[in-house]
Amino acid sequence: MKKICLLILFVSVLLSCSDSERSNKNPYLPNYSVNLSIDMNLPAYSNLKFVSNGVIVPNNGAKGIIIFNAGSGYNAFDAACPNQDVNSCVAMTIDGINAVCSCDKTSYSLFTGLGGKDYPLKQYKVQVSGTVIHVYN
């Protein structure tokens, strides 16, 4: 009986683990290398000091990087529409707490990256050190 309980516990833990690499794969978006640092003391990024504010940093990733202050931390997503060919749309725009695709007008939450389509926003890792935000993959 004890072995069965341990087996069930082990299988439960194993199944609850997720692979962020697998869930972040998207056939529409290439895997560009991202290594970006921004300082929130600079005027272009000072809005990131406040919850529910975001900025788009161009010339990184596929169509730029969206950085968003989610309150409990920062989220970073590619600004390319995740359900469209990367060459068919311009960068997404920020509308409050959502990113909106320029092609199909789909809205994606900047808290979760989820929208109403097959693929969520492509998410990047974030580290914060003082006023510097480092985004990478």
Task: Name every feature range the model reports, one short phrase each.
Residues 112-119:
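Extended Gly/Ser/Thr-rich low-complexity repeat segments
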Residues 1-4:
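Positively charged n-region of N-terminal signal peptides that target proteins for export
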